[in-house]
């Protein structure tokens, strides 16, 4: 599982000209599910997204001291299978490491459900749709989180 996590002042996602998800201060999460992922990876990734200290303390330095939960921030979660694009061969990315849509959608929805259990406001895009994402980055702060399925070749514990 891969998540690109971005600290934002605001973010919104539009499908067919209609805003389907919009947040203020918080985190924009671009989420990709691998062929080897199971529900086991979701708990770790959810906890990491909610607990990473990416926000400065109010009135303090820019040093990140607070998590999204500490600031009662908002989350915009967008599915993005292209995070598993393999560009090592040829001129067209291979997406063979991305989970099939039906598997990915199930795990994506479970991930969103787990994030919502935090009590924070969680908005989403539309799984599988062509989306326009507008982001006002804050910092910018952008990180790539990765958690491979237990027992897979790339397991990073």
UniProtKB/Swiss-Prot annotation:
GO terms for biological process: D-amino acid catabolic process. Keywords: Cytoplasm, Hydrolase, RNA-binding, tRNA-binding. Signal peptide: none annotated. It comes from the Bacteria. GO terms for cellular component: cytoplasm. An aminoacyl-tRNA editing enzyme that deacylates mischarged D-aminoacyl-tRNAs. Also deacylates mischarged glycyl-tRNA(Ala), protecting cells against glycine mischarging by AlaRS. Acts via tRNA-based rather than protein-based catalysis; rejects L-amino acids rather than detecting D-amino acids in the active site. By recycling D-aminoacyl-tRNA to D-amino acids and free tRNA molecules, this enzyme counteracts the toxicity associated with the formation of D-aminoacyl-tRNA entities in vivo and helps enforce protein L-homochirality. Belongs to the DTD family. This is D-aminoacyl-tRNA deacylase. It comes from Gloeothece citriformis (strain PCC 7424) (Cyanothece sp. (strain PCC 7424)).
């Amino acid at each position: 599982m891969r998540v690109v996590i971005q600290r934002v002042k605001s973010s919104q996602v539009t499908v067919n000209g209609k805003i389907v998800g919009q947040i203020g201060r918080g985190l924009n999460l671009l989420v990709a599910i691998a062929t080897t992922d199971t529900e086991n990876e979701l708990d770790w990734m959810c906890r990491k997204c909610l607990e990473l200290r990416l926000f400065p303390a109010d009135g303090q330095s820019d040093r990140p001291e607070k998590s999204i939960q500490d600031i009662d921030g908002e989350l915009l979660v967008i599915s993005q299978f292209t995070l598993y694009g393999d560009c090592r061969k040829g001129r067209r990315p291979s997406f063979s490491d991305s989970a099939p849509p039906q598997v990915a959608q199930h795990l994506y929805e479970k991930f969103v459900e787990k994030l919502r259990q935090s009590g924070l406001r969680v908005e989403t895009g539309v799984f599988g749709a062509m989306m326009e994402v507008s982001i006002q980055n804050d910092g910018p702060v952008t990180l790539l989180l990765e958690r491979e399925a237990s027992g897979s070749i790339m397991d990073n514990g």
